[in-house]
Structures are given as C-alpha cells and as structure tokens.
C-alpha cells in the first residue's frame, strides 16, 4: 500500500507538471506575428473549429484568446529586463506596425509676414551668441533680457535731441515708446494667428462694437434691462419725461373653472349659433356705403360726358362764371350727393356728404 501511494503521488506530481507546461506551451500550425512595441499579436491560423462550434462558440473564442495572449506573454519574458524602483521592467522594442491616425496630418503652418518678406529678399537668419562684451561694466553680459549689455534703461542721463521739445520728459517718452512697440508686436502676433486660422479680420474704418441699433432695438433693450432686477422692474425709478413702455407683457386671464355657468352657457350657444347659421353675416353700413359710392361714380361719369358735349357746342366758359338753372343736384350741400361750387373745366365732384367718397373740391386755375 505504501508503494502504491508513493507511485500515486509521483504520478499526480507528473500530471500537475504536465498541466502547468500545457498552460504555458501553446502549439500553433503557423507562428504568430508579434509587434512587441505595440503589444500586438496577429494570428494567421484559420479558425476552422469555430464554424461548427454551435453553442460552445463563446468558449472556443475565449480559449483562442487565452492561447494567443499566452504566446504574447511568452515573448515578453524573452525581452531584456531592468529594475526600476524595486520593480522588474521589460524594455520594449520600437513598434513596427503603423497604426492609423485618428485625425488627419496637420498642415504646415503658413509663413508670417516677416518670413514672407525675408524669403522674398533672401534674408537668412544668423545665429548670434547669447553673451556679448559690455564695455561699461567690463564683463560678459546677456544680449537681451534682464541684466543685458548696453541697457539704456539704467542710464541716468539722456541727451535731448535738437528737434525735440526741451521741456519734454525723455524718460517718460522712452517708456511710452516701448509700450507702443510691445502693443504693435502683440497686434502683429494676433494678426498672424488670425491669418493662420483663416479668420476674417474686421476693417478699421466703419467698425462698430455693437453695430447700428434702431430706435426699436434700443427701446427693447432698455425695457429688458429695466425688468432684469430682483423686483422685475417694479421699484425701478423712471426719468422725468419717460413714457410708459408699450407692449409690455401682461398676464393672461383665464375664466374660472367653477363660476358663472349662465355666462358660459350663453357664450357656447352664441358660438354654436354662428357656426350653424347658413346666412353669412352682412355689414349693413359697409354695404350701404359701397352702393352710394357706385351711384356717385355713375352720376359723375354722366356729368363728365355732358360737360364735354357742352364745351363742343358753346365754347369754354370763363373761370369766374356760374351756371344758372342747373339741376338741384349741382349746387349747395346735400348728404351723400354731389355738389359744391364749380370753376372752369368739368364740374367738380365736391361738397360735403356723409357716407360717400370725397373725390374733389375747389380746383385751381
């Protein structure tokens, strides 16, 4: 029994060792292609067993992914290692697979105005040393910046030019000139950035920050500003001659849900009566005025024809003559008729009337 137990233990140990080797060792018909720089493993073996896997397809995919990952890890253990802060790190080689970009390749930055001018004139940049010899201090100093050589800001005496005002402060003038140069350089930098991004720059002439606003727009803006307070403009003071805003918001008043049922019934019945009435509603006043206008126009046309016939027979009358024995409708005042004083030419369609169309009056010579 003891011999069998020892044999069983040895057999079990061999099986465990074989299982460990089986987990680490993976056999493939075609070797995988590795790109250790990108931690990439490409399997060129056709997945023949996945076509007829059926319900075990998910398990087959997991087993295949596990085997390929094991092969990739086996390759990583063969790389040279180094210890960094008590940790063992493998040094990856350069990647060999070119991965696609998420965004397009950036375009070359356009040249600035100075670069364009330098290329046109053939000016090439010359490298200058950062240190130069300062004759005043007798030591090497920086060419630019803090503690530079020939620093004019440290001078205690400035010579006044011959064409300058002797009472002008040359120190303040130099500081102002430097501020202007800095502002000009900043403006040129912003212009170069705008040209690089193809932005439309506003013209210097006719540039308005807020644009031209009409009277209505200004009034609307003022009204909105007044009601933008915590009290919604209720305690906002007004100017002495300020007019009340027109078209201000008003609360909608709805009819109560429970209240005067008689008024609600009356309004509903009136609406049904209007909808069910077959005869259209006629405006009597408008129809009467229209009929009177048509009659006046017909009568005026007849009188115009009669006046033209009288001109051919009797000649033209003087400007101050008045007709006698005319029809009663040609003189005086009447309601809704034609009348009034008449001058030379065709009879005037004038006079005072109610409900008619005012078509004339006294005519000039």
Curated annotation (Swiss-Prot):
TM region(s), chain numbering: none
Record's function text: Involved in ribosomal large subunit assembly. May regulate the localization of the 5S RNP/5S ribonucleoprotein particle to the nucleolus.
Modified residue annotations for Citrulline: 273
Pfam families (UniProt xref): RRS1
Signal peptide limits: none
Keywords noted in UniProt: Acetylation, Citrullination, Isopeptide bond, Nucleus, Phosphoprotein, Ribosome biogenesis, Ubl conjugation
Cross-link entry Glycyl lysine isopeptide (Lys-Gly) (interchain with G-Cter in SUMO2), positions: 154, 226, 266
Comp. bias regions, Basic residues: 302-325, 351-365
Feature: compositional bias, Basic and acidic residues: 235-245
Native source species: Bos taurus
Protein name: Ribosome biogenesis regulatory protein homolog
Any one cellular-component term (Gene Ontology): preribosome, large subunit precursor
Keyword presence, Cytoplasm: no
GO biological process: endonucleolytic cleavage in ITS1 to separate SSU-rRNA from 5.8S rRNA and LSU-rRNA from tricistronic rRNA transcript (SSU-rRNA, 5.8S rRNA, LSU-rRNA); mitotic metaphase chromosome alignment; protein localization to nucleolus; regulation of signal transduction by p53 class mediator; ribosomal large subunit assembly; ribosomal large subunit biogenesis
């Amino acid at each position: 029994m003891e011999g069998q137990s020892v044999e069983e233990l040895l057999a079990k140990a061999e099986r465990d060792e074989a299982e460990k080797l089986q987990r680490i060792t993976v056999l493939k018909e075609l070797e995988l292609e590795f790109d250790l720089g990108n931690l990439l493993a490409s399997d060129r073996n056709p997945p023949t067993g996945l076509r007829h896997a059926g319900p075990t397809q998910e398990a087959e995919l997991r087993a295949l992914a596990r085997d390929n990952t094991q092969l990739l890890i086996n390759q990583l253990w063969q790389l040279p290692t180094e210890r960094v802060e008590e940790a063992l790190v493998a040094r990856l080689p350069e990647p060999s697979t070119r991965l696609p970009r998420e965004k397009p390749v950036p375009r070359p930055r356009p040249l600035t105005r100075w670069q364009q001018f330098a290329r046109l004139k053939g000016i090439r940049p010359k490298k200058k040393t950062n240190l130069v010899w300062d004759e005043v201090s007798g030591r090497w100093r920086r060419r630019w910046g803090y503690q530079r050589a020939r620093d004019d800001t440290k001078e205690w005496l400035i010579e006044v030019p011959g064409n300058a005002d002797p009472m002008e402060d040359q120190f303040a003038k130099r500081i102002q000139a430097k501020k202007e140069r800095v502002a000009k350089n900043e403006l040129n930098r912003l212009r170069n950035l705008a040209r690089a991004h193809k932005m439309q720059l506003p013209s210097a002439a006719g540039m308005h920050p807020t644009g031209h606003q009409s009277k209505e727009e200004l009034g609307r803006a003022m009204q909105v500003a007044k009601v933008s307070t915590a009290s919604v403009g209720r305690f906002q003071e007004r100017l002495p001659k300020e007019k009340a805003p027109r078209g201000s918001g008003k609360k909608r008043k709805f009819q109560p849900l429970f209240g005067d049922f008689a008024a609600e019934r009356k309004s509903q019945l009136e609406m049904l009566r209007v909808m069910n009435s077959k005869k259209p509603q006629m405006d009597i006043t408008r129809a009467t005025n229209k009929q009177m206008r048509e009659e006046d126009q017909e009568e005026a046309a007849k009188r115009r024809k009669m006046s033209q016939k009288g001109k051919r027979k009797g000649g033209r009358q003087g400007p101050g003559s008045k007709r006698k024995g005319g029809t009663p409708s040609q003189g005086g005042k009447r309601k809704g008729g034609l009348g009034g004083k008449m001058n030379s030419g065709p009879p005037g369609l004038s006079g005072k009337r109610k409900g008619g169309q005012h078509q004339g009056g006294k005519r000039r010579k």
